[in-house]
Swiss-Prot record:
A Pfam entry, by short name: tRNA-synt_1
Motif ('HIGH' region): 80-90
Annotated localization: Cytoplasm
Gene this protein is translated from: leuS
Protein name per the record: Leucine--tRNA ligase
Residue intervals passing through the bilayer: none
Species classification: Bacteria, Pseudomonadati, Pseudomonadota, Gammaproteobacteria, Moraxellales
Source organism of this protein record: Psychrobacter arcticus (strain DSM 17307 / VKM B-2377 / 273-4)
Binding site for ATP: 670
Assigned keywords, A-Z: Aminoacyl-tRNA synthetase, ATP-binding, Cytoplasm, Ligase, Nucleotide-binding, Protein biosynthesis
């Protein structure tokens, strides 16, 4: 049976009550709620449940694709893999996006913040094997669980746009795009040497090979030749590289640099070394960025898969054995760079194109067949790798670049690497002696090109993207293999090719091969029996275009609706980890250009702005066992003593009362048992506190060191805000003041009576409007998410210390509280919106408060008085007072005058800040 799951109905986070407050909350209805600020203590669980139920009911975060008077804003965090449980990295990532989304809504934007699920992948397959359950069932159960957890965070997500990439409704469109690209020649199939993971039985991209091992299994990677489908990403290499210029200042510079290096455009010369083999003339073609060193070539090296190596293998068992050994290694450049350089002489030679001398051909493990022609010219005197190899095998080393005397002075004692790799004038190069790089390049090209022995060439480090994976849980590749017609694409009307979802894999290869009803089909071309392709797409294919599908997730006739895409794309702010710099982010840029060329989207880039958030770290606690192994313990199982700075100084295991070692602060991980369950933390402190903590503790783009003890700070702050609001509400009730009148004055600065305000009331208004302006700048211009929390805390302190002694001062206090709550609702939406509603405001229609410039004007300022640089007093004066008057006033102050016993040498006035009197002796 072939069947598939659809996303289940959205789980309601709140099941025990319906919201009791309408959207238009009045003073009367606010007081009837069981969480009234006049009658109850701060209870985050009740408040957050009520607000989440309200948001689910009124669907205020759903947005339309129809034209709007409001400007649009698309905020997106990289969507999660449905592992089943949120971790604190998720919490931080999605809180960042949500804070920005809520801020821009208050600023008058129509904000789309969607959520979906990166549903395909190896973890689901592994879990299915372990639990003997279909990956589809495991995946969609996890989606239901994680959706509920995300809703507990109070994220302002448009859930109507939700999808999972493992649903046919989604992946049919990447199958469709694959067919369009196949028609254009941008998809092709070839036999390729690949990284093969012998445990997971799949091909790995170079980026997925770490220290010669598979990134998931940890198995040593082998080389294997298999047929694979490729996306011709190199056709877009120039555009991918050049368009990075558009992203300067909008993306982190390190990500741009990583992509530039990964694409790796090199300008140089292709040189042909002629040879004869078995009576036939041919040439060994090599690419070099240093043709000025051509006269220093003393050997050439080829990959084990190169035709010359294969020829030599057929005639020499030792060479055959060496080539076989090379093929077992990784094909990732990073691994080859770290591996020991080894090789074997083939006994073959090629002719140097300039000197006519015979040059030996070696097979070397550091040469990749998949890069360039699979051959390199070796210049040991001027290349570190070649020098290492030549020294090891006693090959000639010929200097052809002049080496400055200072170079030898800089060489550290005991450093055997004497290759000089800089550019300089040529020596020992015959007619090219004395030339610099450019001159030698031109002269050699002029001599060799007419003989068809060289040509200018641009080469890329980037290689075409192999997307075939020998896994079950992925999107089927829509191709058919026919005995008569060969490889044939599936007809568009037969899409999607649906993946069977009732399969329980056993870990031995791809189970699709063993499902006759999936494999057996008819050839679209000749109608004869044929077999479906059983490879599935690399899961990076799904994540390369999901951002665009969010614009029109329910469109059944288009991959992306052009009108919707024009409204929402590009993504205004994308948020995710820097570890995706050269995989997901590069592939998404590539796919955007592919979709643009299919007239599905406009513009050249998918993400206008990128933020790479820092990792969440936590302390580790462990014991070293007698056998040398290490056991790590969860913090919940440890009693920890902290010093005054919040650092752990003593840790005791609860179960036996014995000490454990306090380890390093490291990235949260299962292996170190130092992860923190967001659910437990939310249950204890509430989601608002967790949100505040994750953004207040460190800048969003830097690492966050988690501390359970430090959560008390944001929690106490939220409780303080609750107390301030409660006391203010009681004062309003006692004064019999109308909330409608107060709110009108707060939301309309012109309606606020500011005549004759006390000094304290003016100071509170000034602090309020300074905070409004600062947070607006921090979020809207600087993308600084931690400093606004500090500003809110400072404003709350001012409010807490302010005592209103009149109706006018109660109005000032009300204004400050309302503005505080509006800004707080960006970070802590549950308490912020709840208190605003209790105070009679409709949170759906609220805007970010406007700065009242008149409130920033100071009637009096406090200036510091110094004598010889030491503070001796203060004085309140009018701003921009006359400097001479300030000097006289400062000298006259009793606390200052006693320090002026000597001759006054100098008086310095720093306008509106200080007066410094310099006295002799």
């Amino acid at each position: 049976m072939l069947w598939h799951y659809k996303i289940s109905p959205h789980l309601s986070v709140i099941t025990n009550s319906e919201p009791t407050m309408s959207n238009a909350v009045t003073a009367e209805t606010a007081n009837t709620n069981n969480t009234s600020i006049e009658n109850a203590q701060y209870q985050p669980q009740l408040i957050e449940a009520a607000q989440q139920a309200k948001w689910a009911t009124d669907k205020r975060f759903e947005v339309s694709n129809e034209p709007s008077d409001k400007p649009s804003r698309y905020m997106l965090s990289m969507f999660p893999y449905p592992s089943g449980k949120l971790h604190m990295g998720h919490v931080r990532n999605y809180t960042i996006s949500d804070v920005l989304s809520r801020y821009y809504r208050l600023k008058g934007y129509e904000v789309m913040q969607p959520m979906g699920w990166d549903g395909f992948g190896l973890p689901a397959e592994n879990a299915a094997i372990a639990n003997q359950t279909p990956p589809a069932k495991w995946t969609f159960e996890n989606i239901d669980s994680m959706r509920a957890q995300l809703k507990l965070l109070g994220l302002s997500i448009d859930w109507s746009r939700e999808f999972a990439t493992c649903s046919p409704e989604y992946y049919q469109w990447e199958q469709w795009l694959f067919l369009q690209l196949y028609k254009k020649g941008l998809v092709y199939k070839k036999l390729a040497t690949v990284n093969w993971d012998p445990i997971d039985n799949t091909v790995l991209a170079n980026e997925q090979v770490i220290d010669g091992k598979g990134w998931r299994s940890g198995a040593m990677v082998e080389k294997r030749d298999i047929p694979m489908y490729y996306f011709n990403i190199t056709d877009y290499a120039d555009e991918l590289l050049d368009d990075l210029d558009q992203l300067e200042g909008h993306w982190p510079s390190e990500v741009i640099t990583m992509q530039r290096n990964w694409i790796g455009r090199s300008s140089g010369m292709e040189v042909h070394f002629p040879y004869e083999l078995a009576g036939e003339s041919n040439s060994l073609d090599v690419f070099t960025t240093r043709p000025d060193t051509l006269m220093g070539v003393t050997y050439v090296a080829v990959a084990a898969e190169h035709p010359l190596a294969q020829y030599a293998s057929e005639h020499n068992e030792a060479i055959a054995a060496f080539c076989a050994l090379c093929k077992k290694g990784s094909v990732a450049e990073a691994d080859l760079a770290k591996a020991e350089k080894v090789g074997i002489d083939t006994g073959l030679t090629v002719t140097h194109p300039l000197t006519g001398e015979e040059v030996p051909v070696w097979v070397a493990n550091y040469v990749l067949m998949s890069y360039g022609s699979g051959a390199v010219m070796a210049v040991p005197a001027h290349d570190e790798r070649d020098y290492e190899f030549a020294t090891k095998y006693s090959l000639p080393i010929k200097q052809v670049i002049d080496i400055p005397a200072r170079y030898f002075d800089d060489i550290e004692e005991g450093n055997d690497n004497r290759a000089y790799t800089e550019r300089n004038t040529l020596v020992n190069s015959g007619e090219f002696d004395g030339m610099d790089f450019e001159q030698a390049f031109a002269a050699m090209l002029a001599k060799l090109e007419p003989q068809s022995l060289a040509k200018k060439k641009i080469q890329y480090r980037l290689r075409d993207w192999g997307v075939s994976r020998q896994r079950y849980w992925g999107c089927p590749i829509p191709m058919v293999n026919c005995e008569h017609c060969g490889t044939v694409p599936v007809e568009e009307q037969d899409l999607p090719v649906i993946l069977p979802t009732d399969v329980v894999p056993d870990g031995r290869g791809n189970p699709l091969k063993n499902i006759p009803e999936f494999v057996n089909t008819t050839c679209p071309k000749c109608g004869n029996p044929a077999e479906r392709e059983t490879d599935t797409f690399d899961t990076f294919v799904e994540s390369s275009w999901y951002y665009a599908r969010f614009a029109s997730p329910n469109d059944t006739t288009n991959m992306v609706n052009k009108s919707a895409a024009n409204k929402w794309l590009p993504v205004d702010q994308y948020i995710g980890g820097v570890e995706h710099a050269v995989m997901h982010l590069l592939y998404a840029r590539f796919f955007h250009k592919l979709m643009r060329d299919e007239n599905l989207v406009s513009g050249d880039e998918p993400f206008a702005n990128l933020m790479t958030q820092g990792m969440v770290l936590a302390g580790t606690f462990y014991r070293v066992n007698p056998d040398g192994s290490t056991t790590y313990y969860f913090t919940k199982d440890i009693d920890i003593d902290f010093n005054e700075r919040g650092q752990p100084i003593k840790a005791i295991l609860k179960s036996d009362g014995q000490p454990v070692t306090i380890g390093k602060i490291e990235k949260m991980s299962k292996s170190k048992n130092n992860g923190v369950d967001p659910q437990i933390t939310i249950d204890k402190y509430g989601a608002d506190t967790v949100r505040l903590y994750t953004l207040f503790t460190a800048p969003a783009d830097q690492t966050l060191e988690w501390s359970d003890d430090a959560l008390k700070g944001p929690y106490n702050f939220v409780k303080k805000v609750w107390r301030i609001a409660s006391e203010h509400m009681q004062a309003l009730t006692a004064a019999n003041l109308s909330l409608d009148t107060l709110n009108n004055g707060t939301l309309n600065n012109d309606a606020l009576n500011t005549e004759g305000l006390s000094k304290e009331a003016k100071a509170l208004r000034r602090k309020t409007h300074e905070t409004i302006g600062k947070i607006d700048s921090d979020l809207g211009k600087r993308l600084a998410l931690n400093t606004p929390v500090s500003s809110l805390m400072e404003l709350a302190n001012e409010l807490s210390n302010f005592k209103a002694n009149s109706e006018q001062e109660l109005q000032v206090q009300h204004e400050a509280l309302i503005d505080l709550l509006i800004m707080l609702s960006v970070y802590a939406p549950h308490i912020g919106e709840h208190l605003l509603e209790q105070l009679g405001l409709d949170t759906v229609t609220l805007n970010y408060p406007a700065v009242d410039e008149s409130a920033l004007v100071q009637d009096m300022i406090t200036m510091v008085i110094q004598v010889n640089g030491k503070m001796r007093g203060k004085m309140d004066v009018a701003p921009n007072s006359d400097p001479e008057a300030l000097k006289a006033q400062a000298r006259a102050i009793e606390g200052v005058a006693k320090f002026l016993t000597g001759e006054i040498k100098k008086e310095i006035v720093v306008p509106n800040k200080l007066v410094n009197i310099v006295v002799a002796g």
